Regions:
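Charged docking surfaces used in two-component/phosphorelay signaling
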Residues: 15-23
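Active-site beta3 strand of CheY-like receiver
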Residues: 44-50
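C-terminal output helix
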Residues: 106-115
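Receiver (REC) domain active-site loop signature in two-component systems and cognate sites
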Residues: 55
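Short hydrophobic/Thr-rich beta-strand motif most characteristic of the beta2 strand and flanking loop
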Residues: 25-32, 40
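Active-site residues of response regulator receiver
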Residues: 52, 82
Length: 120
């Protein structure tokens, strides 16, 4: 069973994402922001990180950069799931090391499709 770290400062969004992922057969650990996610990622292995962009303490791009600094996370897929859809933000995501960029509101089937594509 693949494990996913789901990061979002919105409790309702975390629950919606977790419900979708667990329903598709994934193990999910939730984090409330980038700092919380970074600490959890240091403590255990995840097959994929799915993160919001705009969060307190550490945003999604900051988390992506920080994870990519460590060899342990060089190849871990990181998807950013956010309301931000500008080409400049997507480019910033690629430069930070994000594997992909998905826009909220999200289609649950599309989310699962993208995750399956990048981790299997």
């Amino acid at each position: 069973m693949h494990s996913i770290l789901a990061v979002d400062d919105s409790a309702s969004m975390r629950k919606m994402v977790s419900f979708t992922l667990v329903g598709a057969g994934f193990k999910v650990v939730e984090a409330v922001d980038g700092q919380d996610a970074y600490e959890k990622a240091q403590a255990q292995h995840f097959d994929l990180v799915l993160t919001d962009q705009n969060m307190p303490r550490m945003d999604g791009l900051g988390l992506t950069r920080k994870l990519r600094e460590h060899p342990k996370f060089k190849t871990t897929p990181i998807l950013i799931l956010t309301t931000e859809s500008s080409d400049q933000m997507k480019q910033a995501g690629r430069q930070a090391g994000a594997t992909g960029w998905l826009v909220k509101p999200f289609d649950p089937h599309r989310l699962i499709e993208v995750i399956n594509k990048v981790i299997r």
